[in-house]
Regions:
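Non-heme Fe(II)-dependent double-stranded beta-helix
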Residues: 1-26, 32-128
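Short hydrophobic-aromatic micro-motifs
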Residues: 32, 142, 191-193
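A conserved hydrophobic position in a structured secondary element of the catalytic/binding core
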Residues: 81, 157, 193
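A structural signal for short, well-ordered beta-strand segments
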Residues: 101-104, 140-142, 213-217
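Short coil/turn motifs at secondary-structure junctions
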Residues: 106, 145-147, 200, 220
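Short edge-strand/loop segments of extracellular domains
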Residues: 107, 157-163, 216-221
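Catalytic core of non-heme Fe(II) oxygenases with the double-stranded beta-helix
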Residues: 111-184
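Catalytic core of Fe(II)/2-oxoglutarate
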Residues: 170-221
Length: 221
């Protein structure tokens, strides 16, 4: 973690619905705590332990599996159709929303971190395909492990999705930013982001892995 990074460790459970909507619309990110309980996390970890994964092109310590939405079962019941998540998304986007993607990712010890980037790329890309060209999307990142400073915590540049500057080109990547924020969270929480906000994660310098289920939803329009 950068020694200059700010840490946003507020009590997210104290936010009202209006404050949550404003947070993701204006700041570009939000934490919804306690969406999964300890037993649900354990059940999901038992499932993910059976999955075959592949390494990213930049690190053997970053593993992933795509298209987990087609597995059904626990992924649908506990994650994709999580009632508290859907309740918030309906308040944010309206009643009709569409699931665009669902991916599993595991950051193992030695993972070098992910540079600051956006998931919203209006002309498509080799990484996100045409899905990233949706005009509006909310990424919902469920964490099955605690986000701590040493095990790949989430990082984000608040309000970067609002910038008109050339440096906010959604195809750019940055190693760091002076206003980036580290966002810790407990296992079972989800970090929600506007898909145009610059975000990433810090290296895993700890002794354990960090598992994540990353979903993308958009309004039906």
């Amino acid at each position: 973690m950068s020694s200059t990074s700010l840490i946003d460790d507020r009590d997210w459970s104290s936010l009202t619905l209006g404050e949550r909507i404003r947070q993701i619309e204006v700041e570009g990110y939000l934490v919804l705590p306690g969406l999964l309980d300890a037993q649900q996390i354990a059940d999901l970890k038992t499932l993910t332990a059976t999955w075959e994964t592949q390494a990213t092109d930049y690190s053997e310590s970053q593993r992933f599996r795509q298209n987990i939405e087609f597995d059904g079962g626990l992924i649908n019941d506990l994650v994709i159709a999580n009632p508290r998540t859907l309740e918030f998304l309906h308040a944010l986007c309206g009643r009709d929303i569409i699931l665009m993607s669902a991916i599993y990712a595991r950051s193992e010890p030695g993972h070098p971190g992910i540079s600051l980037h956006t998931d919203g790329q209006p002309y498509g890309s080799a990484i996100f395909g045409s899905a990233g060209s949706a005009p509006f999307m909310v990424r919902v990142l469920y964490y099955l492990d605690d986000l701590t400073p040493d095990i790949s915590p989430f990082r984000v540049v608040p309000r970067s999705h609002l910038s008109f500057h050339a440096d906010a080109n959604p195809y750019y990547r940055f190693d760091s930013h002076p206003e980036e924020v580290m966002v810790p969270a407990e296992a079972g929480s989800a970090v929600l982001i506007n898909h145009r906000v610059f975000h990433g994660n810090f290296p895993n310098v700890g002794s354990g892995s960090r598992e994540m289920l990353a979903l993308g939803y958009r309004p039906s329009w």
